[in-house]
From Swiss-Prot:
Positions annotated as glycosylated: 231, 336, 390, 403, 492
Gene: EPHA3
Topology of this chain in the membrane: Single-pass type I membrane protein
Tissue expression pattern: Highly expressed in the developing brain and embryonic tissues. In adult, the greatest levels of expression occur in the brain. It is expressed in a graded manner across the retina with the highest expression at its temporal pole. Detectable in all other adult tissues examined, except the liver.
Substrates-to-products reaction catalysed: L-tyrosyl-[protein] + ATP = O-phospho-L-tyrosyl-[protein] + ADP + H(+)
Motif PDZ-binding per UniProt: ranges: 981-983
Binding residues for ATP: 628-633, 653, 700-706, 750-751
Name of protein: Ephrin type-A receptor 3
Originating species: Gallus gallus (Chicken)
Residue numbers bearing the Phosphotyrosine modification: 596, 602, 701, 779
Membrane side Extracellular: residue ranges: 20-540
Length: 983
């Protein structure tokens, strides 16, 4: 054979394929790419007549350089080709990609003893380019390279191109650079291209945090990289990700929030445009300026009000700017002697606000001064003078026959900010002539056997000129059946013609031009006996003496009472405080600590709903479709569009028509609970609708639904790191609930919702009502029904629910996640589950479950609740596993498992199986029965020896049935070992 013709054929076979090379991924950094080098490669060939450098063009007529070797006729070939020195930059792990063609030795005549179909790849590390001469012993072998496809002479004739691509790893390397070498031992091979590269995690932006180009350190662990927030943002939680050895970013934690005045656009925080604003940090869009406000700058925190429009300190930035109201209208006065009722109409313009109130200014006009002056403090306004919310007021205790002016101001929340003149309506009135007020005190100045001298003061409110006084008197024993009236012009009178030693009753009233006033209260005075007469002077002395004696007695009593109360107060003060603390509102709030408040402690459940849940307008909610049915009504998906906010997807629970008050209270009870929580791993309550029908609870929408069904649908499709990330989110949410003092009681994968970003959130806080209709709560105790498969032993036996019982339930959720949604305890009855757990049996580890995670399950299932981990500890454990993923590669060893594990399908009678079909049906894998028909695995004895590779060969390629069959085989092996041996 012509040795110089064969290289040309090899080159032709290779160049046609070189142009169809795919673009390299973005996480690969080339250290060498022979296709990109212009001119000769200049690699060293040893011996010099071995490898030969050939020039050519690809299908795009781009020049490329290749090396080939085709000395297949001679024995003991040892032809070496060494590259130039390649700097490694920052890489520790190097990848070598070879593209080559190789001739099938069978297609070359007379070379069966000398022709080879492989070649060898070597490397040597060096800190500099000093290797002038080739020394074979200095190189370390990487691998022997063989072709997946080799070509023949017929392929060349048909122009069938067979280009091989092989990639090998080198490293870790530590020196500054290295050489590659290729050893030919007798193959007909053409080296079309050599690409040397390393992998990096490329620069990326995640959750508004920038992560730089990162090169993996080694092949065993992830590199934790701290992100930096993009411009105009700040950390909410320190952002970090992990760089894998494959150059992939994993497990994003934390995020950044755009500053006030900036919104998230793409992967950056961009300034709000003119006409838009954002008042606080957060990843929400800038809002359009509300009515009567504007902004002309970028990055506005709020919008400035137009001229004569204002925003009060209590108004949120999203509220429209408003102005003071116009004046009240149509004032009407209704005068009744010394009182007046004022009525008016609402202003035509309320200024755009609902907090309009009215103030009354009263002015007294006329008299000696021609200027009006403020009314005296004696004038009263009913119900009050300022802050009126209704359009009527009654003014009493005015002076009779007096001119008054009343100014009615209309004000609202921004009136104090305006410099414009007051907006008021005025009305002037004159009060009528009125009766005088009653005389309050009548004094006895002198008595005799047949007369009494009386005096009094003018009425406090004469309401005009007093014309005279009417004095009415009669004997007390006559009971007003016969009385006498006399009139006096002054404020004193002497009444004569009375009987000695007789008690008389006196009443006096004043008269003005209007009429008589009301009579005074009744005063009783007694005339003197026949032989006794007291002057007014002596009478005063006697009265002073009596008054002094009475005062001393009263003072003694008061001092005694005060001393007793002071002592009693000191004794009871502590106890009173304790009662106040204990019986306040059914709960105690400590300063600086947010605690859960049980809505059932409220006498009025509606108060709890209004306190913790936001009332939504039903017009802002649109329902798209019904996605399910709940206990009280339908569950829908829809959209919520609040004013000045972006439309969001929501889940909507509705209360069906014809509900009872108890059903409504139970329905809204869950909202009262949810509304108290604010955590990224707790389902967020958007609000409730209670003022219209149907009554609704609106929450954030979780695209992937419940975690258990999601995992069953995506069986074996996630990495362990992704599953641990989900579990970490659940644990973080439960830590938050535990810190608030809330016990969930129904923690299960079916009550965990998962969104499109694989973020898990704890939901379903209506245990007290839901469990009554939950099919998983078929075991009844004294207090109702509880989900047996997820509930701790002490909660089942004593209904003792604590955060420790939630930790037990978390262990079951952990088992559900790692088994991709399998049902805990499978088909065991509730009584069998209770008995097995009480006897110390625990669930076995799921298939391929990391030992660290199964140990965490067992810790959560400690019988003594005090030995179970707290959720804070669980979060810490999962964080450590995420930071050190190599620890998750240790799978639970079947031989090292505890002996007290429950077997899957433990209630199946294995002895009843006679054929493989019976066995597969018994373990719920009957769909595989047809595959095993007619093959060597047709009996139980042979099928018990099947491996995962064997299953793939016969067609069982789906992971779910594979897992069930493997679990069934373990059960069959256990049964076989424990079965008696026939004799």
């Amino acid at each position: 054979m012509d040795r110089r013709r064969l290289p040309l054929l090899l080159l032709c076979a290779a160049l046609g394929s070189a142009g169809r090379l795919s673009a390299r991924p973005g996480n690969e950094v080339n250290l060498l790419d022979s296709k990109t080098i212009q001119g000769e490669l200049g690699w060293i060939s040893y011996p010099s007549h071995g490898w030969e450098e050939i020039s050519g063009v690809d299908e795009h007529y781009t020049p490329i350089r290749t090396y080939q070797e085709s000395n297949v006729m001679d024995h003991s070939q040892n032809n070496w080709l060494r590259t130039n020195w390649i700097p490694r930059n920052s890489a520790q792990k190097i990848y070598v990609e070879l593209k080559f063609t190789l001739r099938d030795c069978n297609s070359i005549p007379l070379v069966l003893g000398t022709c080879k179909e492989t070649f060898n790849l070597y490397y040597m590390e060096s800190d500099d380019d000093h290797l002038a001469k080739f020394r074979e012993h200095q190189f370390t072998k990487i691998d022997t390279i063989a072709a997946d496809e080799s070509f023949t002479q017929m392929d060349l004739g048909d122009r069938i191109l067979k280009l091989n691509t092989e990639v090998r790893e080198v490293g870790p390397v530590s020196k500054k650079g290295f050489y590659l070498a290729f050893q030919d031992v007798g193959a007909c091979v053409a080296l079309v291209s050599v690409r040397v590269y390393f992998k990096k995690c490329p620069f990326t932006v995640k959750n508004l945090a920038m992560f730089p180009d990162t090169v993996p350190m080694d092949s065993q662990s992830l590199v934790e990289v701290r992100g930096s927030c993009v411009n105009h943002s700040k950390e909410e939680e320190p952002p970090k990700m992990y760089c894998s050895t494959e150059g992939e970013w994993l497990v994003p934690i934390g995020k950044c929030l755009c500053n006030a005045g900036y919104e998230e656009r793409g992967f950056a925080c961009q300034a709000c445009r003119p006409g838009f604003y954002k008042a606080s940090a957060g990843n929400v869009k800038c809002a359009k300026c509300p009515p009567h406000s504007s902004t002309y700058e970028d990055a506005s925190l709020n919008c400035r009000c137009e001229k004569n429009y204002f925003r009060s300190e209590k108004d949120p930035p999203s509220m429209a700017c408003t102005r003071p109201p116009s004046a009240p209208r149509n004032v009407i006065s209704n005068i009744n002697e010394t009182s007046v009722i004022l009525d008016w109409s609402w202003p035509l313009d309320t200024g755009g606000r609902k907090d309009v109130t009215f103030n009354i200014i009263c002015k007294k006009c006329g008299g000696s001064s021609k200027i009006c002056e403020p009314c005296s403090d004696n004038v009263r306004f009913l119900p009050r003078q300022t802050g009126l919310t209704n359009t009527t007021v009654t003014v009493v205790d005015l002076l009779a026959h007096t001119n008054y002016t009343f100014e009615i101001d209309a004000v609202n929340g921004v009136s104090d900010l305006s410099t414009l003149s007051r907006q008021f309506a005025a009305v002037s009135i004159t009060t009528n002539q009125a009766a005088p007020s009653p005389i309050t005190v009548i004094r006895k100045d002198r008595t005799s056997r047949n007369s009494v001298s009386l005096s009094w003061q003018e009425p406090e409110h004469p309401n005009g000129i007093i014309l005279d006084y009417e004095v009415k008197y009669y004997e007390k024993q006559e009971q007003e059946t016969s009385y006498t009236i006399l009139r006096a012009k002054s404020t004193n009178v002497t009444i004569s013609g009375l009987k000695p030693d007789t008690t008389y009753v006196f009443q006096i009233r004043a008269r003005t031009a209007a009429r008589y006033g009301t009579s005074s209260r009744k005063f009783e005075f007694e005339t003197s006996p026949d032989s006794f007469s007291i002057s007014s002077e002596n009478s005063q002395v006697v009265m002073i003496a009596i008054s002094a004696a009475v005062a001393i007695i009263l003072l003694t009593v008061v001092v005694y009472v005060l001393i007793g109360r002071f002592c009693g107060y000191k004794k009871s003060k502590h106890g009173t405080d304790e009662k106040r603390l204990h019986f306040g509102n059914g709960h105690l709030k400590l300063p600086g600590l947010r605690t859960y408040v049980d809505p059932h402690t409220y006498e009025d459940p509606n108060q709890a709903v209004h306190e913790f849940a936001k009332e939504l307008d039903a017009s802002n909610i649109s329902i798209d479709k019904v996605v399910g049915a709940g206990e009280f009504g339908e569950v829908c998906s829809g959209r919520l569009k609040l004013p000045s906010k972006k439309e969001i997807s929501v889940a909507i629970k509705t209360l069906k028509a014809g509900y009872t008050e108890k059903q409504r209270r139970d329905f809204l009870g869950e909202a009262s609970i949810m509304g108290q929580f604010d955590h990224p791993n707790i389902i967020r309550l958007e609000g409730v609708v209670t003022k219209s029908k149907p009554v609704m609870i609106v929450t954030e929408y979780m695209e992937n639904g419940s975690l258990d069904s999601f995992l069953r649908k995506h069986d074996a499709q996630f990495t362990v790191i992704q599953l641990v990330g989900m579990l970490r989110g659940i644990a973080s949410g439960m830590k938050y609930l535990s810190d608030m003092g809330y016990v969930h009681r129904d923690l299960a994968a079916r009550n965990i919702l998962i969104n499109s970003n694989l973020v898990c959130k704890v939901s379903d806080f209506g245990l007290s009502r839901v469990l009554e209709d939950d099919p998983e709560a078929a075991y009844t105790t004294r207090g109702g029904k509880i989900p047996i498969r997820w509930t701790s032993p002490e909660a089942i036996a004593y209904r003792k629910f604590t955060s420790a019982s939630d930790a037990w339930s978390y262990g079951i959720v952990l088992w559900e996640v790692m088994s991709y949604g399998e049902r805990p305890y499978w088909e065991m009855s509730f009584q069998d589950v209770i008995k097995a757990v009480d006897e110390g049996y625990r669930l076995p580890p799921p298939m391929d479950c990391p030992a660290a995670l199964y140990q965490l399950m067992l810790d959560c299932w400690q019988k003594d609740r005090n030995n179970r981990p707290k959720f804070e500890q669980i979060v810490s454990i999962l964080d450590k596993l995420i930071r050190n993923p190599s620890s998750l590669k240790i799978i639970t060893n079947a031989a090292a498992r505890p002996s007290n594990l429950l077997l899957d399908q433990s209630n199946i009678d294995i002895s009843a199986f006679r054929t493989a079909g019976d066995w597969l049906n018994g373990f719920r894998t009957g769909q595989c029965k047809g595959i095993f028909t007619g093959v060597e695995y047709s009996s139980c004895d042979t099928i018990a020896k099947i491996s995962t590779d064997d299953m793939k060969k016969v067609g069982v390629t789906v992971v779910g049935p594979q897992k069930k069959i493997v679990s069934s085989i373990k059960t069959l092996e256990t049964h076989t070992k424990n079965s008696p041996v026939p004799v």
